[in-house]
Swiss-Prot record:
GO terms assigned for molecular function: magnesium ion binding; orotate phosphoribosyltransferase activity
Gene behind the chain: pyrE
E.C. numbers: 2.4.2.10
Record-given protein name: Orotate phosphoribosyltransferase
InterPro entries: OPRT (IPR023031), Or_phspho_trans_dom (IPR004467), PRibTrfase_dom (IPR000836), PRTase-like (IPR029057)
Amino acid sequence: MTDHRTRFLQLALDADALRFGEFTLKSGRLSPYFFNAGRFDSGAKTAQLAQCYADAIDAAGLDFDLLFGPAYKGIPLATALACAYAGRGRDLPLAFNRKEAKDHGEGGTLIGAPLAGRKVLIVDDVITAGTAIREALAIIRAAGGMPSGIVVALDRQEIASDQDRRSAAQAVAAEAGIPVIAVANLGDLLAFAAGNADLVGFQEPLLAYRGRYGTDTTG
């Protein structure tokens, strides 16, 4: 497992953003783990998280020249990532959307750098149903931008349903025709748990969950 994946998972565990136990998801599934990016709730935690994102993006070789953060969690993530890249000598333009359009001031739903003609990388925490990402794709295209990729913190790599064996990330990637990458995925989480004495007890529930809900590419 590459270093940024291990660093991210340890950071998430330390921040209590990654928890193990029994959690009922919005889908109704009973999951042995839960990820909440909202627990990266300080400058230091967010800065470290952004470095993990940047390492994952660079490792994937994504081609982009603007960062876009969908409201709401994508906004601080994209902002922190822009700061991380500035520290690496790359000053990237940044934009995000608001949920409700304004009819005063600058107006509209978009804030930040113009999207027209830009290769836009969408930055978010997870892809659950894909609704927010699809909205972001539509907003970017309507503004003349060209979506070039999507990056999230954690890919759960689980099927949408028994009828659709793809994950939400796989479905979005196929629909949009762009790469979707994650800092870490369920396969990485399994490897991380196996190498952590405090988490070995969760290995069996994780494997059972992957067996029931994992995509064919989970590994």
